[in-house]
């Protein structure tokens, strides 16, 4: 019996050491920034330590608000930036499956609607947006810049390439994102 206990202890220690060796430390979450996105206003605000630092027009889903798989809707509520993708890419660089293709698409290129420039991949933090990450909900650049300011996306939050490039440089993974069916004036009062 003592040999069996010793073996169990050694196995537990070995498993713990292997687990520790496989852990990759993450950068600390960005707790200084927050993004507020108003669906009725089709606007986004960047807050840094509670103070407004930027405001941009966006485009949310043309089908409205929701989080069901394959709904093509924008999820509402509290989310966070789970991953940042696109460091150093030129404006208009096409990203397919989150990887650059080498193609660059100009603004308002006819018949083109790829994800371009940068991706901020969102993870839902509430029951009402729990599918956001698996649905590949991003804040990203779009070549359809003439549609910015009106609902036109398939669930993501679209921005002009110049705007997403600037925003991407200012925030980190872990930045909180709040998307609501309220005017920004109400969201900023909270």
Give the residues covered by each predicted segment.
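Bacterial N-terminal signal peptides that target proteins for export
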Residues: 2-10
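C-terminal motif of bacterial Sec signal peptides marking the signal peptidase cleavage site
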Residues: 17-20
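Bacterial signal peptide processing site
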Residues: 22-24
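Exported/periplasmic cell-wall-interacting domains
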Residues: 26, 68-71, 89-190
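Post-signal peptide N-terminal segment of mature Sec-exported envelope proteins
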Residues: 27-50
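Structural motif
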Residues: 41-43, 78, 119
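Electropositive
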Residues: 57-89
């Amino acid at each position: 019996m003592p040999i069996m206990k010793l073996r169990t202890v050694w196995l537990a220690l070995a498993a713990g050491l292997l687990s520790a060796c496989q852990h990759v430390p993450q950068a600390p979450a960005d707790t200084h920034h927050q993004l507020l996105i108003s669906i009725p206003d089709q606007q986004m605000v960047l807050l840094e330590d509670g103070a407004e630092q930027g405001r941009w027009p966006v485009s949310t889903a043309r089908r409205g608000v929701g989080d069901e798989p394959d709904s093509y809707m924008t999820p509402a509520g509290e989310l966070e930036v789970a991953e940042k993708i696109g460091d150093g890419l030129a404006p208009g660089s096409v990203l397919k499956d989150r990887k650059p293709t080498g193609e660059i698409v100009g603004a308002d290129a006819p018949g083109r609607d790829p994800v371009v420039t940068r991706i901020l991949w969102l993870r839902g933090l509430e029951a009402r947006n729990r599918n956001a990450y698996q649905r590949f909900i991003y804040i990203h650049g779009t070549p359809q810049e003439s549609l910015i300011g009106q609902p036109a996306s398939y669930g993501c939050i679209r921005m002009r390439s110049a705007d997403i490039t600037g925003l991407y440089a200012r925030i980190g993974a872990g930045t909180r994102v709040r998307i609501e069916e309220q005017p920004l004036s109400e969201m900023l009062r909270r």
